[in-house]
Amino acid sequence: MKLGTMVHMRGADLEDKIRQVHENGFETCQICCWNGAWLTDEAADRIRTLCETYQVEISTFWCGWSGPGVWDFAEGPLTLGLVPPEYRFARMEELKRGSDFAKRLGTGNIATHVGFLPEVSGSGEYRAVVAALKHVAHHVKANGQYFLFETGQETPVTLLRTIEDIGTDNLGINLDPANLILYGKAN
């Protein structure tokens, strides 16, 4: 298994960050972006060239989304991912744009936090989130990619049920074990 690290598209120069990945002995990285204005063809081409220069494979594009995000149990379910209805459509569009950016980067994986998935499968909230995720998953599939859920904010049973209910063959997990501990849902 190859080990890598995450490179954020912010702050210090990207060339320095990608060179450090190589100099630290890693062969792969995830590129992470929370600012949709940076998802340009020029940025993708530059990152791809830098990764080729420093022999670093982009394993996944980690796509953030706009709007508020509070990483706790009180406000997290109201602000994170595709769960809050008031941010859902804009974030769906941002994830689709992120998929297009990832395609230009040459990676077959796009990951994000999809939010605190509703536990009650018969609820309207659950059905709406599944429909939104399915819409994004189809776009990602059309780009020849896998759509990876960064997990931890939901129980494993809910995660599996959601993936099965979406029903596309291009879904997976971007496992961050720290989230399992942080959110206490690793039952």
Range-by-range predicted roles:
Residues 9-11, 33-35, 64-67, 114-118, ...:
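Active-site-proximal loop/turn and secondary-structure-junction residues that shape catalytic pockets
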Residues 1-103, 107, 141, 168:
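N-terminal pre-domain/capping segments
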Residues 28-29, 61, 130-187:
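Acidic/histidine-rich catalytic cores of soluble enzymes
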Residues 69-71, 81, 116-122, 181-184:
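A short acidic, helix-capping loop that chelates divalent metal ions and anchors anionic groups
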Residues 117-134:
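Active-site cleft segment of glycoside hydrolase catalytic domains centered on the general acid/base Glu
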Residues 40-42, 86, 121-126, 184-187:
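Short, solvent-exposed loop/turn segments at secondary-structure boundaries
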Residues 98-122, 143-145, 152:
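Active-site groove signature of glycoside hydrolases
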